[in-house]
Swiss-Prot record:
It is a multi-pass membrane protein. The system is composed of three essential subunits: KdpA, KdpB and KdpC. It is found in: Cell membrane. Belongs to the KdpA family. GO terms for molecular function: P-type potassium transmembrane transporter activity; potassium ion binding. PANTHER family: POTASSIUM-TRANSPORTING ATPASE A CHAIN (PTHR30607), POTASSIUM-TRANSPORTING ATPASE POTASSIUM-BINDING SUBUNIT (PTHR30607:SF2). Pfam families: KdpA. The chain crosses the membrane at residues 4-24, 65-85, 133-153, 177-197, 253-273, 285-305, 380-400, 417-437, 484-504, 528-548. This is Potassium-transporting ATPase potassium-binding subunit. The gene is kdpA. Part of the high-affinity ATP-driven potassium transport (or Kdp) system, which catalyzes the hydrolysis of ATP coupled with the electrogenic transport of potassium into the cytoplasm. This subunit binds the extracellular potassium ions and delivers the ions to the membrane domain of KdpB through an intramembrane tunnel. Keywords: Cell membrane, Ion transport, Membrane, Potassium, Potassium transport, Transmembrane, Transmembrane helix, Transport.
Amino acid sequence: MKYIVMQDAFFVVLLLVLAVPLGIYMYKVMIGEKVFLSRVLEPVERFGYRLMGVSEVGMSAKRYAVSVLAFSAVGFVFVMAVLMLQGFLPLNPEGMKGLSFSLAFNTAASFVSNTNWQAYSGEAALSYFSQSIGLTVQNFVSAATGIAVLFAVIRGFIWKKQKTIGNFWQDLFRVTLYILLPLSLILALLLVSQGVVQSFADYSVVETLENGAKQLIPLGPAASQIAIKQLGTNGGGFFGANSAFPFENPSSFTNLIEMLAILLIPVALVVMFGRAVKDSKQGRAIMTAMMIVFVIGVVAITISEQFAGPHYQGVATSGSMEGKEVRFGVGGSSLFAASTTAASNGAVNAMHDSLTPLGGLVPMFFMQLGEVIFGGVGSGLYGMIGFIILTVFIAGLLVGRTPEYLGKKIEPYDMKMVCLLILVPPLLTLFGTAVAVMMPSVQASVSASGAHGFSEVLYAFTSMGNNNGSAFAGFAADTTFTNMVGAVMMLLARFIPLVAALYLAQNMAGKSSVAASSGTLSTKNGMFIGLLIGVVVLVGALSFLPALALGPIADFFTTFK
């Protein structure tokens, strides 16, 4: 246990050390300031603008949102076409056939929405072309879209009396060129150096030591996809077992760098936010709130898995190792589970369905908080900004003052947008789960009975409704109902809050700043951090406690029988 504590502490310190300079760098990218890569990348940037016919004229929220939706729609159609027609496309050495309509629809929606929910196993269903040209490209652009929208939201708070919030195409291109591509290249090379597969060769057939039986070894351009799947909080694995598979995550060292990659950009964006609003204490307050909840979650999962519960008393000395890789152990698996669900990533290095009831409760609850404990790249922070505004609004009601945040007054229109930001994911999750448990096809998809069976369904629709993508593996996801309903949920959960954030940004950008007074609520002290954590947890608890009581909480109490 002492080793696990030291490992987790080292991870947090290293994460912060890496995130601070990256956050400063991303701030310069956001405002268009020259960075050390400018000499190399500026000509590429200018050529790209000319090639796409992009002007640098600012956009209103409506035009920005239309650009995001149109771009995502084109990506959706392209990915769906690639998946259904992959049997006729190149780079298909294993002769993979096209996916069914419902599965292709679900997968396209999943990757366009930055969810990466997978109702298939990559090595058994997709060609190299589909993986690299279809899905990997979407991993880049969906992540870049989230960060671009965050840039627009931040401009809303730092600009005054403006009718625009930036240019989507410029933001998208700069994020991809200056942030995602360089980081992904570095990480991909690092992964390849550690033994992660990167090849376009045919699958290998080897003779095993047992009776000379033949075994097919899947290969593929995995490292390049894994790099952006982690950095972009996408999470979709090249192989079905995701980061539990040795070809994706071969050692404890690669496990460390993949966990760092999952949280690096979300944490760095908080640093960038503090820089952008010219008050680093604002960023530190948000970081502290996120980190407190994250650390509590890591501790809860680790204790639950290490001490396992009454069934294992006096039996297991190394904790519950069911569904875990020996090379990662309880500590590496618990930290990964917390990171991937706190950051809206969804990659897994252990089977979450095999976690203890309380160990599985924490990742589920992280998602149900709205993926704002770091959250997805871009989307996590603008979601947290929605909770900050809600906290300021509640505090203003308590003292009878007009609420303000960063010098901008909070008005009824702003609160309407905040409600869309905060309430759409839980509504989709609960409605989807309620409908699903009544469907015979979903009931047949559940491998467990009782409370754990309900937990499998709740986890699946929580994951899709909050754009995470991880799953309890006992849930068989490839059914027409789950594919179609899940796809609609993922698209709505992604784009309704996104559009609401843009309209919130424009309304804020049109306001002038008001001077802080002695009665202004400070949003950078310990009291506000406590209020913010309370509001985030309370909204999640009020929304999901009844469902959690029927699932993982009831599952926990069955272990005492």
